[in-house]
């Protein structure tokens, strides 16, 4: 018997895959801009981008203070 919780998890995963697929096209430069607009803020893509930007900013701040 399928439990309601399993059903809900399946639906959420399915929607997440559909949403992630919206940003991918053959044109790489256009797809990157579209991904940032269409992906939810909680996705790994945004988390990693934010982390990279903060590291780059910290590095540039260190360079300026030298």
From Swiss-Prot:
Residues 1-23 form the signal peptide. The keyword Ribosomal protein does not apply. This is U-scoloptoxin(24)-Er2a. It comes from Ethmostigmus rubripes. Keywords: Secreted, Signal, Toxin. The keyword Signal applies. Coiled coil: none annotated. Belongs to the scoloptoxin-24 family. GO terms for cellular component: extracellular region. Expressed by the venom gland. GO terms for molecular function: toxin activity. It is found in: Secreted. It comes from the Eukaryota. Residues 53-66 have a biased composition (Basic and acidic residues). Residues 43-66 are annotated as: Disordered.
């Amino acid at each position: 018997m399928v439990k309601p919780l399993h059903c809900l998890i399946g639906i959420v995963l399915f929607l997440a895959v559909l949403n992630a697929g919206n940003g991918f096209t053959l044109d790489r430069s256009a797809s990157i801009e579209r991904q940032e607009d269409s992906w939810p803020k909680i996705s790994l893509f945004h988390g990693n981008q934010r982390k990279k930007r903060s590291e780059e900013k910290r590095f540039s701040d260190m360079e300026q203070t030298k």
